[in-house]
Amino acid sequence: MGSKSPNGEDRGPNGPSAKKAVASINPPKSAAASGLLRGALEDQDEDGDDDEGKIGADMNVSEKTANGTKKRRRNNKKKKSAQAAQQTAPPRVEIATLFHNRPYPEGEIVEYGINDENLVRTTDEEFRHLAVANNMNDEFLRDYRKAAEVHRQVRQYAQTIAKPGISMTELAREIEDGVRALVGHQGIETGDSLKAGMGFPTGLCINNVAAHWTPNPGAREVVLQHDDVLSIDFGVHVNGRIVDSAFTVAFNPMYDKLLTAVKAATNTGLKESGIDARMDYISETIQEVMESYEVMINGKPLPVKALSSLSGHNILRYKIHGDKQVPFVKTRTSQRMEEGDVFAIETFGSTGIGRTRDDVGVYGYSRNENVSTAGVHLASAKSLLKAIDENFGTLPFSRNYLERIGVKNYHLGMRSLIASGVVECYAPLVDTPGSYVAQFEHTVLLRPNCKEIISRGDDY
């Protein structure tokens, strides 16, 4: 989910360091980013032949005993192995069922550079610290890997249905229903969506819409066309640990270079991320890669521009945006990444002016926990705030989410909460009309001994 640059500026902040997210520090293992589970267990022995069937047949042969009576030997043929659970299409099998008694897959494990003296752990005290921390953060890592696997399985299905002719309402519903089914929390009962579910409303941004657009109840239906560029951005959380990842699809090959540029820029940001990595260096490197591409749109060459008004961001528990930012353009900032941080590394590339503005409409809302509720006096506002706190906390939510849990006649109360600053409202962000914007994003965990690109999959 894209983070707006503070105060509308085009560069990263020099703000204070964010609170450290809980560090996940299991020892590095081989990278294994899985997609949908495929196939079933095969009923074969190690050499691949079916010796067991022949043995069973022989064991069934009746033999005469010494007193002339017949004795039938027990058939020792093993029962066939049960088939491994498989995901459905659309995905509706809870992820805990698919991975019963098995660990969730790791993301892409990337070792830190061994030549970086700031990252080398050599002292006995440091090794003891790592050993203790390894035993303290299993839950953190398990939650993140579960959320990431849900994201992979849901987005793989979304890619099969995100085709010309589908409405954005249907696409958002399939994504969000899939997430809720796979985490095992429908979010209808009070507080259930805080256990696991959507990290924020599904973003479905077409053409010059860069970020923060989702279908709203009663709004005009939007249907995907062949010449559209569609960015799909959604988050999955388990116990408040949010995986934020996004990708872009296009059906006309003239947009291929745009998608390639943005994907390359995001991968550059991931490559340069790490403990003590400087935000200004990462930002400059991202822009250099992004803007080295050019795209031909209807016979006209256009440069790919990095959006200056959006940025990547760190993620805190139950808060999709922390107070650290990773811009996509050259910036001056003293911020660095730290051990234990969780970052959403994302980039947006545009054929427009490379800067967004607020459009009409509403994407969603979020609770501002730093603003006092003492000024909230309207009864409808108090009732709405209670529903928000009990069901969403500080997670962003949309009008659809409110209506889904049965909240009605909320508009007056919402206006009051926004006016008092207790709730923040997000508008869609757009570049110039006629331009095209693409986005790619991954979540990375900065563990002490490696970084784990937790949302990495076979698709991107």
Curated annotation (Swiss-Prot):
Binding site for substrate: H212, H321
Manner of cofactor binding, per the entry note: Binds 2 divalent metal cations per subunit. Has a high-affinity and a low affinity metal-binding site. The true nature of the physiological cofactor is under debate. The enzyme is active with cobalt, zinc, manganese or divalent iron ions. Most likely, methionine aminopeptidases function as mononuclear Fe(2+)-metalloproteases under physiological conditions, and the catalytically relevant metal-binding site has been assigned to the histidine-containing high-affinity site.
Catalyzed reaction equations: Release of N-terminal amino acids, preferentially methionine, from peptides and arylamides
The keyword Protease is assigned to this record: yes
One matching Pfam family: Peptidase_M24
Assigned keywords, A-Z: Aminopeptidase, Cytoplasm, Hydrolase, Metal-binding, Protease
Basic residues biased stretches: 69-81
Annotated residues for binding of a divalent metal cation 2: D244, H313, E346, E441
Principal localisation: cytoplasm
Reported cofactor(s): Co(2+); Zn(2+); Mn(2+); Fe(2+)
Enzyme class: hydrolase
Region annotated Disordered, chain positions: 1-90
One cellular-component annotation, GO: cytoplasm
Statement: the UniProt record of this protein carries the keyword Metal-binding: yes
InterPro entries per record: Creatinase/aminopeptidase-like (IPR036005), Met_Aminopeptidase_Type2 (IPR050247), Pept_M24 (IPR000994), Pept_M24A_MAP2 (IPR002468), WH-like_DNA-bd_sf (IPR036388), WH_DNA-bd_sf (IPR036390)
Transmembrane segments: none
Residues holding a divalent metal cation 1: D233, D244, E441
Domain of life of the native organism: Eukaryota
Location of the protein in the cell: Cytoplasm
CDD domains: MetAP2 (cd01088)
Biased composition (Low complexity): 30-39
Molecular function GO terms recorded: initiator methionyl aminopeptidase activity; metal ion binding; metalloaminopeptidase activity
Function description: Cotranslationally removes the N-terminal methionine from nascent proteins. The N-terminal methionine is often cleaved when the second residue in the primary sequence is small and uncharged (Met-Ala-, Cys, Gly, Pro, Ser, Thr, or Val).
Family the entry assigns: Belongs to the peptidase M24A family. Methionine aminopeptidase eukaryotic type 2 subfamily.
UniProt name for this protein: Methionine aminopeptidase 2-1
Organism: Leptosphaeria maculans (strain JN3 / isolate v23.1.3 / race Av1-4-5-6-7-8) (Blackleg fungus)
